[in-house]
């Protein structure tokens, strides 16, 4: 009989405040709230929404089908509940923050999304990626409109520029063109790592201007002022270039052809940051004349734009100094009188206009910063996300307020709030579960945290040294920690106090293990010794009194000296042996009572980093930096099997206790290759691979009942993997892995074929073949074959009925019968409607030209029967564009197209009349409501503005 195993699945992840892969977004609280707002941040593959004031997690956005990290987040300008989130695999998902669900997902880029921006109306989204392309997405039709190519390296900045076209009225006044011949699709400003600054016209879908944005290499950031009249590009060596953008000129150029020589972007000069590393972000304040810029250092620089009066004052001061250096005082007085009136602010150097206001020092290296605009506060507020897993919120007094309070040039900023408790500042190096599996201890550099496993809440935080190992002592009230400096520290969970600290070793304590009888603990160190410590209750005198109080202490009982550094120690569950892994690649097994050598295990080519002994004390499993796992027998020390387990160093192994599925010989291994693997120690087979971490998996802990596993990695996350009731078989797992490998190579080869055709064009189609689109294309082809066969069958039946009215109905395909005896066209339409709008074009590209006549036959039937006309038109026009040359060359298609045109035109005219009638009726109803509700004697323009303000937000329209 084939052996089955129980599957482990990812259940929950916690411990991450904000990951370093993405930017952060500040959003306002609800109107009735008193907080300072919320922070929307990436946490590996999830998006988290934090209340900044309370430090509470409000919502968690997770798509179970997505396992890659989030790389970019953007908020819609119109609907504040809608967020676009870009991922490392090039996919984009639109989330509704109120209900934490995906509205629509797009797939068009080949690599990580670096930039996202919504347009003013909120119905288009621009995305930039590491694959150098920019794609414009239509959020209403849920399709990619087109792709812009031009950058030679990743896109580092992207902003919509949408000037409102102005025309001269007959009376000479200027009026805005909101719609009509003069309105355009707008423009896009983009920067790339290739140091190019490009201005794209979205109407002509081409680049109209290109500039070198940096003099010394790459451009890493782009900031555009709120009015779009200026922008700043920043790159290496602290250099920032200021550009002025002629928005009026852009608006006037709409629809004109003779503007090829006109330059809309002008270089105004260069500013230099205090720090010389590369800039990561430039963020203009939405309402005030400030901008923030930062690199990866522990500081964010806030710059201020001077007022016209200040610039004039500065220029006059400079001229006065220049005159003072001259020798003729009479001439100086005459020039001074002339200069007072003739100061031209436009001629001022850019360094006189933009000045550094304050440098805000942060608690960690910066990853992202965002301006916060809490209601009713006039100061500047900035939210920063750092690389050490925390969010900080700073208050900076504005220039006006600072001038009133003090005469200091540099204002005093304050670190008002932070979100840092729900995570460690550094990588977690050790994990330990309590005996009842309800509490989890995690140790990192500088901190030890105790978590509730069920609620994922952080119960206690202790300050400690650089922790390398930790363990719960029997009773689960005390945790012992071994540090890099050689200290052993005892912490009391209940009182949140440090009980005792012992200078145990001269080197780092790499391993701790509690004796199975629970009365002692052993510590293994880099000072080539293992020390045994007994737990003793000592009566300690209270300072200043004669009273004594009982206190737990560690008392050194004996020492085991070895020839090399000890990296790992383990007691056997039967308390007979203790195994020590040494730096010389060997594992030595000693008797616990006499400390005499029992076995010497040779075989690994690099040091053994971890080991574990099975619960029946018969097997010992060791893992090493040589990527191998070795299973040994503890009776003779023979190597049962060497498994090439991972693609990188194997950091930890742990046996699963006697659970419902195993005999205690199953074990887990974790590695630097970001995976955890589940093994059968008797059959020497890999049972399952657990993917989820986005960095090295430093530590693991298996529950005492074996019903779950906890892992911690370089991505700062703590992940819980639950044992499920689902059974898995080894053959099926191997087949699934091979399928995944095949699918990944299949889609990449398809993409490569598509790229060679139009790689040099500046404008292309926004398409990408994925497994989903390939399967959708196959479903369409299958539906067309079934549908055509059924149409021919029913046609023959109709002909037979003419000669013989009593002819028996034919036996139709079982699919049509199962769906309630529906017609062939209804079945094909149902298949087309089930395909996501974003994937439809790519699915249609899978169809060979031989299937096009069949598809057009059904499109004609859809037009005749008025079945989902928007979808019918969309498919028809896309297929005409794609197969234009073949269709023109085919005689048979011409007659078919004539029929489709006539039927479609009649149906569209009918729908147009219906929509016009309904629109007119809605306008009448709206007028009646307004007449009945507003009774004020006010002018008409105010009434219209008020009505627009009270209108509801637009919802997303699903076409298909």
Which residues are covered by each model-predicted region?
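Terminal intrinsically disordered, low-complexity extensions flanking WD-repeat/beta-propeller proteins
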Residues: 3, 13, 239, 248-280, ...
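Conserved strand-to-loop turn within each blade of WD40 beta-propeller repeats
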Residues: 42-43, 86-89, 128-131, 191-194, ...
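Canonical WD40 repeat/beta-propeller blade segments in eukaryotic WD-repeat proteins
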Residues: 18-30, 67-75, 111-117, 153-180, ...
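Beta-strand-rich domains and repeat architectures in extracellular enzymes and scaffolds
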Residues: 11-45
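Short coil/turn linkers that define WD40 beta-propeller blade boundaries
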Residues: 55, 100, 142, 205, ...
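Short C-terminal beta-strands that terminate individual repeats in beta-propeller domains
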Residues: 10-16, 58-65, 102-108, 144-150, ...
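Structural hallmark of WD40 beta-propellers
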Residues: 34-40, 79-84, 102-104, 122-126, ...
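WD40-repeat beta-propellers
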Residues: 47-51, 92-95, 134-138, 158, ...
